[in-house]
Amino acid sequence: MSRIGKKPVTVPSGVTATVDGQTVKMKGPKGQLQFLVHDDVEVKFENGQVKVAPRAETKRARSLYGTARAQIANLVEGVTKGFEKKLEITGVGYRAAMQGKNLQLALGYSHDVVYQIPEGITIAVPKPTEITITGIDPQRVGQVAAEIRAYRPPEPYKGKGVKYAGEFIFRKEGKKK
């Protein structure tokens, strides 16, 4: 049995939770999110807590209900605090700038890369070498960060490229004569 799944998710004041069949909806100060729970997982909302339990004692149901509980906890955190990812740009001439509703990246290519910011995501550029991505859905925030990083992943020799803040890049030694 999942230890994570056994704990109920407490819904704080200011957040309204509704469970409609297999759909869990959370509405809070930052916005509204919903999550479709797998059929093998049972969801109940009572006394300001969302409780999750497996419908059957199968291995699949036991593994899914811990995941469902974590996803519901992310919904609560998303509509109250939101999620944030930071990226760092390293390299001579590598920089980022906001251009209207788009993110313009100079990453050493012959042209600038223009990234269209999806709905529900906010991108800020406090410095030309830092990008901050915020939103209420952790999956979308992480996906946007991964897409931006994929334009120029950090290389192991000089460490140039786009990396997550705090990410360690394994460095390699160059050729020897």
UniProtKB/Swiss-Prot annotation:
InterPro entries with a match to the protein in the record: Ribosomal_uL6-like, Ribosomal_uL6-like_a/b-dom_sf, Ribosomal_uL6_a/b-dom, Ribosomal_uL6_bac-type, Ribosomal_uL6_CS
GO biological process, one term: cytoplasmic translation
One GO cellular component term noted in the UniProt record for this chain: cytosolic large ribosomal subunit
Keyword RNA-binding: yes
An example Gene Ontology molecular-function term: rRNA binding
Keywords for this protein: Ribonucleoprotein, Ribosomal protein, RNA-binding, rRNA-binding
Pfam families: Ribosomal_L6
PANTHER family: 60S/50S RIBOSOMAL PROTEIN L6/L9, LARGE RIBOSOMAL SUBUNIT PROTEIN UL6M
NCBIfam families in alphabetical order: L6_bact
HAMAP family per UniProt: Ribosomal_uL6_B (MF_01365_B)
Function statement: This protein binds to the 23S rRNA, and is important in its secondary structure. It is located near the subunit interface in the base of the L7/L12 stalk, and near the tRNA binding site of the peptidyltransferase center.
Similarity remark: Belongs to the universal ribosomal protein uL6 family.
Subunit structure as annotated in this protein's UniProt entry: Part of the 50S ribosomal subunit.
Protein name as annotated: Large ribosomal subunit protein uL6
Record organism: Bradyrhizobium sp. (strain ORS 278)
Species classification: Bacteria, Pseudomonadati, Pseudomonadota, Alphaproteobacteria, Hyphomicrobiales
